């Protein structure tokens, strides 16, 4: 073990892996629950619109996939031998980037999905506007995924221990 590769270096990579999946799944579950409540309330009055308005729930679920992708990439690089502290910090940052972006995107999708679904039941022309706002909310999570993938690609460069 050297100063560049201490014994505790893989801990930071493992925390990045954990942060990626935990925070994105928190956002996805909040978005799913909040949108699902709106769909259930809307379905009482307009059951014909339930399938059409399931879009926010699907978009919230996609947020969890972003965290899964980054988590798998980080866990694939985790080793006990020859793991640099630099790699651990970069992978922690990658996990936090996708995780917190996914958490924010999930909150936005849940709030917009709930209000949009309820509004669509009263005024069907609101559907297109709801979809556009949901796309912008989903892109927030995608930004975190892109940053995490770029960071993780830098972490796996040759580091000598």
Curated annotation (Swiss-Prot):
GO cellular component: membrane; proton-transporting V-type ATPase, V0 domain; vacuolar membrane
All ranges on the Cytoplasmic side of the membrane: 32-53, 114-125
Membrane topology reported for the UniProt record: Multi-pass membrane protein
Positions on the Lumenal side per record topology: 1-8, 75-91, 152-161
GO molecular function, one term: proton-transporting ATPase activity, rotational mechanism
Subcellular location: Vacuole membrane
Keywords: Hydrogen ion transport, Ion transport, Membrane, Transmembrane, Transmembrane helix, Transport, Vacuole
InterPro entries: ATPase_proteolipid_c-like_dom, ATPase_proteolipid_csu, ATPase_proteolipid_su_C_euk, F/V-ATP_Csub_sf
Record site: Essential for proton translocation: 138
A Pfam family assignment: ATP-synt_C
Ranges that cross the membrane: 9-31, 54-74, 92-113, 126-151
Keyword Ion transport listed: yes
SUPFAM superfamilies recorded: F1F0 ATP synthase subunit C
Subunit structure: V-ATPase is a heteromultimeric enzyme composed of a peripheral catalytic V1 complex (components A to H) attached to an integral membrane V0 proton pore complex (components: a, c, c', c'', d, e, f and VOA1). The decameric c-ring forms the proton-conducting pore, and is composed of eight proteolipid subunits c, one subunit c' and one subunit c''.
Function field: Proton-conducting pore forming subunit of the V0 complex of vacuolar(H+)-ATPase (V-ATPase), a multisubunit enzyme composed of a peripheral complex (V1) that hydrolyzes ATP and a membrane integral complex (V0) that translocates protons. V-ATPase is responsible for acidifying and maintaining the pH of intracellular compartments.
Family membership: Belongs to the V-ATPase proteolipid subunit family.
Record's protein name: V-type proton ATPase subunit c
Taxonomic source organism: Neurospora crassa (strain ATCC 24698 / 74-OR23-1A / CBS 708.71 / DSM 1257 / FGSC 987)
Gene: vma-3
């Amino acid at each position: 073990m050297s100063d560049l590769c201490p014994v505790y270096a893989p801990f930071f990579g493992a925390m990045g892996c954990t942060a990626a999946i935990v925070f994105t799944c928190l956002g996805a579950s909040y978005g799913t629950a909040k949108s699902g409540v709106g769909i259930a309330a809307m379905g009482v009055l307009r059951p014909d619109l339930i399938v059409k308005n399931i879009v926010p729930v699907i978009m919230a679920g996609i947020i969890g996939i972003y965290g899964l992708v980054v988590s798998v990439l980080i866990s694939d690089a985790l080793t006990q031998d020859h793991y640099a502290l630099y790699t651990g910090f970069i992978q922690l940052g990658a996990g936090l980037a996708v995780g917190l972006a996914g958490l924010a995107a999930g909150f936005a999708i849940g709030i917009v999905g709930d209000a949009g679904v309820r509004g669509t039941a009263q005024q069907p022309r609101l559907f297109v506007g709801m979809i556009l706002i949901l796309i912008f909310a989903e892109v927030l999570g995608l930004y975190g995924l892109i940053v995490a993938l770029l960071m993780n690609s830098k972490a796996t460069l040759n580091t000598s221990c």
